[in-house]
């Protein structure tokens, strides 16, 4: 589902509800009106949200609404917010009072606060059944989890504290490298361990934040596995991966399975996966160049041998991983994994480097492969830079 459609208010979208009237409810920060944050004790704020719900969803439906401050580190400290208990970096008191008021006004709807930045502090009162919390896992490192690490204990304690005041605990977690959608990101075994911990400590729902509508390598397989783990986090990950590849890739199933599960096992080293990682960090964590390059170079044979849907999917994967091959080559420059050799003062690009570029140009044939990261950096521009500055 599109969260903007299936939730009455989703994420940090409260300003969409307020529209031009947002200026009436700007926060007071350091004694001055500040348009970077909102005031949650404002009567105008309550009335505008109330009208929005009545006009668009009615009073008898069962919709969900997130009431969250903007993603900034400061809270409103106007006289009313301060009287409720707000401090410079804690908006929990005022946000809680607004949510409680809305939950009483609309008992059929459900309202969520967040546990992130200015609302990290847990509420100090029992919440009604139609109120919950969405806990951000942004600060919980993506790495092997055994429940004994200090970061594991810290996040588990946060969930336990929320469990004391509500049974409606959702987690907002992350499953992609947002600087590079195209390089493989072996998150499945780590995600399984996190799901087990979340469930053990009272979570009742999980949101996985991935690449959205943009293509991400192995994404269909990962979606298949994660969907199964959301139902039962005890299922064996390797068997789920094998099941998907057996079903969708009759020719290349073993080759894909062997390489992808190797990536997953590499990621179990205990090193942190970077949510915003360059190729060098990925290489240090799980993407061993020699193994990846062998896999990439073998791909052409499997594309040629496969037929129909499998061939199209392999061609799509080959195209996306050409970006990874080019990033490795760019980073390694003139060594065994690079794009060129030095000949005295001259630099001689390898013949295969132009083949990588040609292969990546085929991204236009595939839906969702226009950008390679969260910032919407265009693959076409990346190719242009290679042609103008690296291979020129």
Label every PLM stretch briefly.
Residues 1-65, 69-107, 132-135, 160-186:
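Feature activates predominantly on carbohydrate-active enzymes
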Residues 37-47, 54-55, 153-254, 258:
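Structured mid-domain segments that build the active-site/substrate or prosthetic-cofactor binding neighborhood
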Residues 59-60, 125-128, 200:
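Extracellular/periplasmic catalytic domains that process cell-envelope and extracellular macromolecules
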Residues 74-79, 142-143, 218:
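Short acidic/His/Gly/Ser-rich catalytic and metal-binding motifs that mark active-site loops
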Residues 86-102, 129-148, 198, 227-235:
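Acidic, His- and aromatic-enriched active-site or binding-groove loops in soluble protein domains
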Residues 111, 115-139, 182-187, 215-223, ...:
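Substrate-binding cleft/loops of secretory-pathway carbohydrate-active enzymes
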Residues 119-127, 131, 139-165:
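Noncatalytic carbohydrate-binding groove/subsite architecture in carbohydrate-active enzymes
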Residues 229-392:
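Catalytic domains of carbohydrate-active enzymes that cleave complex glycans
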């Amino acid at each position: 589902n599109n969260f903007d459609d299936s939730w009455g208010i989703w994420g940090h979208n409260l300003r969409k509800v307020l529209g031009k009237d947002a200026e009436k409810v700007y926060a007071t920060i350091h004694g001055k009106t500040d348009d970077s944050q909102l005031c949650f004790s404002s009567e105008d704020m309550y009335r505008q949200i109330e009208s929005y719900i009545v006009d668009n969803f009615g009073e008898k439906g069962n919709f969900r609404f997130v009431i969250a401050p903007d993603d900034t580190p400061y809270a409103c400290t106007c006289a009313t917010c301060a009287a409720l208990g707000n401090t410079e970096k804690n908006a929990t008191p005022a946000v809680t009072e607004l949510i409680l008021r809305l939950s009483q006004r609309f008992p059929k709807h459900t309202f969520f606060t967040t546990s992130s930045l200015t609302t990290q502090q847990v509420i100090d009162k029992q919440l009604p059944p139609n109120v919950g919390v969405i806990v951000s896992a942004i600060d919980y490192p993506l790495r092997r989890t055994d429940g004994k690490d200090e970061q594991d204990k810290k996040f588990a304690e946060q969930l336990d504290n929320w469990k004391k005041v509500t049974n409606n605990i959702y987690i907002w977690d992350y499953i992609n490298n947002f600087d590079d959608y195209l390089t493989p990101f072996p998150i499945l075994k780590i995600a399984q361990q996190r799901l087990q911990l979340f469930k053990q400590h009272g979570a009742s729902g999980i949101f996985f934040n991935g690449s959205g509508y943009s293509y991400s390598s192995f994404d269909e397989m990962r979606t298949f596995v994660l969907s199964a783990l959301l139902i039962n986090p005890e299922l064996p990950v390797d068997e789920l991966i094998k099941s998907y590849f057996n079903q969708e890739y009759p020719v290349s199933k073993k080759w894909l399975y062997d390489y992808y599960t190797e990536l997953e096992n590499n990621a179990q080293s205990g090193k942190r996966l970077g949510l915003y990682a360059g190729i060098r960090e990925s290489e240090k964590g799980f993407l061993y160049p020699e193994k990846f390059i062998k896999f990439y170079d073998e791909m052409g044979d499997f594309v040629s041998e496969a037929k129909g849907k499998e061939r199209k999917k392999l061609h799509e994967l080959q195209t996306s991983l050409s970006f990874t091959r080019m990033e490795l080559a760019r980073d390694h420059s003139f060594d065994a994994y690079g794009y060129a050799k030095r000949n005295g003062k001259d630099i001689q690009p390898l013949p295969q480097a132009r083949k990588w570029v040609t292969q990546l140009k085929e991204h236009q044939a595939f839906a969702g492969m226009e950008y390679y990261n969260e910032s919407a950096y265009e693959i076409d521009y990346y190719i242009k830079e290679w042609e103008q500055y690296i291979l020129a």
